[in-house]
Amino acid sequence: MLKTLPPTLREKKRYVAFEIISESEFPQKEVVGIIRSAVLIYCGIHGCSKVNPWLIDYRHPSGILRVSREYLDLLRSSLMLFDEYKRNPINIRIIGVSNSVKHIREKFLHVSHEPYYKVIQKLKKRNLVK
């Protein structure tokens, strides 16, 4: 059985609050495609694997991304330069960056973190989340 990595050897992550400004609404699966294509166009496949963008939460028009700390600037520049998706104009604005999801939700998205915390606690009681 594999041992887990100690915290000092794990990849450092940052959480990015973003907002999509567009005429149309996008479902969560399409937002994943938008973020991936923005990073792929600007950074390429190797850069996308290094940035490692992961969509944590999305409720139109804002969401939360998890990215690698070292490549945060690449993500910022690729999202700023992305201006068109499926021939529709689109603008992705970064609201803020933090090292915790709780801080992102409360400070930048103005959403209480407590409902999410209660769901996680219920799942832990059922032994579904470690």
UniProtKB/Swiss-Prot annotation:
Protein name from the UniProt record: Ribonuclease P protein component 2
Record-linked SUPFAM superfamilies: Rnp2-like
EC number: 3.1.26.5
Family membership: Belongs to the eukaryotic/archaeal RNase P protein component 2 family.
Quaternary structure and partners: Consists of a catalytic RNA component and at least 4-5 protein subunits.
Function: Part of ribonuclease P, a protein complex that generates mature tRNA molecules by cleaving their 5'-ends.
Reactions that this protein is recorded to catalyse: Endonucleolytic cleavage of RNA, removing 5'-extranucleotides from tRNA precursor
Top-rank taxon, per record: Archaea
Molecular functions (GO terms): ribonuclease P activity
Keywords noted in UniProt: Cytoplasm, Endonuclease, Hydrolase, Nuclease, tRNA processing
